[in-house]
C-alpha cells in the first residue's frame, strides 16, 4: 500500500473531490450503508449550540453539518468553508432545497482560513481533517479562529486495529476491494475511492489524534468511538 506524499496531497484531494462531487452523497450512502447520516446526527447532537452562535464548518462543502446545526439551533449563523468549489456548489443547492438560504459559503483551505482571530463560537469538521496536507496547520487555524472557550468538533474515520484476525481481513477486503469497485461502478472513478480508503488507513489512531489536538492548545480534549471505532468524534475547548 503506497503512502500519500504530503507535497502532492493538496492537488490529489482537489482532483478527487472534483471527480466525485456530483455523486458524493450517493457514494457515502452506499459505502457506509447510510451510517454516515447517523454519525453526523450524533456529532451535531453532542453539542449544545448557544443562541445566535457563530459556527464555522470546515471542509463542509456538502452542507450536511451546516443544515443539521441550524435545524438544532435555528438562530445559529453558519459559515461553510471548503477548498473545492464544486463541493460548495452541491452543498448550496442542497441547502436551498432544504429551505436554508442564510449560510455563508467560502472557498478556502482549512490550512489558511480567511477569517479573523477569535471569530467563531464553534468549529466543526466532518470527514475532512484527514484530507488536509498539513494537519497541524489546519488544527492551528481552527484554534486561531475560535473565541476563548470555543469548541472544536471533529468527526473522522479511524484506522481499524482489531485483535480479531477474521474481522480485520473482512474489513480490509471491504475497504480495499469492495469500496473501489463500488466507486468504479457508481461514480465511474475507482482511483478516487482507492485514495479515500488509503487516507483512512494512514490517519492517526484516536489517542494520537487527541494528542495532536492538544498540542495546538486545545484543552479538555476527549474522543468517543462510534460503530465499534470505525469513526471517532473528537471535541476540544480553546
Swiss-Prot record:
Check the record and name the NCBIfam families matching this protein.
Answer: MenG_MenH_UbiE, PRK00216.1-5
Sorted alphabetically, which Pfam families does this protein's record hold?
Ubie_methyltran (PF01209)
Concerning InterPro entries, the annotation shows: SAM-dependent_MTases_sf, UbiE/COQ5_MeTrFase, UbiE/COQ5_MeTrFase_CS
Does the keyword section mention Ligase?
Answer: no
- Record's catalysed reaction(s): a 2-demethylmenaquinol + S-adenosyl-L-methionine = a menaquinol + S-adenosyl-L-homocysteine + H(+); a 2-methoxy-6-(all-trans-polyprenyl)benzene-1,4-diol + S-adenosyl-L-methionine = a 5-methoxy-2-methyl-3-(all-trans-polyprenyl)benzene-1,4-diol + S-adenosyl-L-homocysteine + H(+)
Q: Which UniProt keywords apply?
A: Menaquinone biosynthesis, Methyltransferase, S-adenosyl-L-methionine, Transferase, Ubiquinone biosynthesis
The signal peptide, as residue positions, is none
Mind listing the GO molecular function terms for this protein?
A: 2-methoxy-6-polyprenyl-1,4-benzoquinol methyltransferase activity; demethylmenaquinone methyltransferase activity
Keyword Repeat attributed: no
User: Which species is this record about?
Assistant: Wolbachia pipientis wMel
- Residues that bind S-adenosyl-L-methionine, according to the entry? 62, 82
The pathway noted for it is:
Quinol/quinone metabolism; menaquinone biosynthesis; menaquinol from 1,4-dihydroxy-2-naphthoate: step 2/2; Cofactor biosynthesis; ubiquinone biosynthesis
| Protein's job | Methyltransferase required for the conversion of demethylmenaquinol (DMKH2) to menaquinol (MKH2) and the conversion of 2-polyprenyl-6-methoxy-1,4-benzoquinol (DDMQH2) to 2-polyprenyl-3-methyl-6-methoxy-1,4-benzoquinol (DMQH2).
This enzyme's EC code(s): 2.1.1.163, 2.1.1.201
Q: What is this protein called?
A: Ubiquinone/menaquinone biosynthesis C-methyltransferase UbiE
PROSITE patterns according to UniProt: SAM_MT_UBIE, UBIE_1
Q: Which family does it belong to?
A: Belongs to the class I-like SAM-binding methyltransferase superfamily. MenG/UbiE family.
At the top of the EC hierarchy, this enzyme's class is transferase
Q: Which GO terms describe its biological process?
A: aerobic respiration; menaquinone biosynthetic process; methylation
PANTHER family from the UniProt entry: 2-METHOXY-6-POLYPRENYL-1,4-BENZOQUINOL METHYLASE, MITOCHONDRIAL, METHYLTRANSFERASE
